């Protein structure tokens, strides 16, 4: 993601050199995510074309500035957004200002599904990031600040943000892992641990994508790797299984449709029952909007 951040920075500097609006540039939305090195969530661009990564998004505080900026957009590649709520900033170098990842997350809430808002939040909370490390408390504090402004309604999407936060978790490595975790809990299974650390029988330390430590069940998302990576992962899996763990491998196909997802959660439920004696009913899938209300 660092390369994407650097490329976005070059594009922003080039754009700024070609457009003189007489105001401080604050880049936002998907442009801000690219500058921060955050994975772009899935957006319905047919409904929200201005959020395309090809557009240059700017954020202004005062709606009166919007026409002034748009008037100079001869190529129609600029998208201007008004955000009069408390704004948080980040910088790249000493010349590029953009909305911070958490602020951008809140701004995008009204354009994203609840699932994609959770996925974006997890992306910001990942272990290895280009931007500074954030915690769930940072998200909570920003939402409190948005609610605390007297005499002004909270921005659209804040309720969705508050709900998304209940299912966001730090330390993930990919959006696929987040969607896997959400699939598991939507089908009535317990929330698994993320990046659980174990020392295998061979003495090596491994971090499991998702795990139920008490039942010694490891759930790993397997992407497409070259042969050398496959051999390494095979040795890793053998060591984990030799240490008494059940290893459940998940692929892109496992999450591709309802029947595959059901097959996966039934397998996890079976292993949990075999190791804990607890039976889980997993055939029904609870919508995320309903799930967050119960938490």
Model-derived segments and spans:
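Surface segments flanking catalytic/ligand-binding clefts of nucleic-acid enzymes
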Residues: 135-295
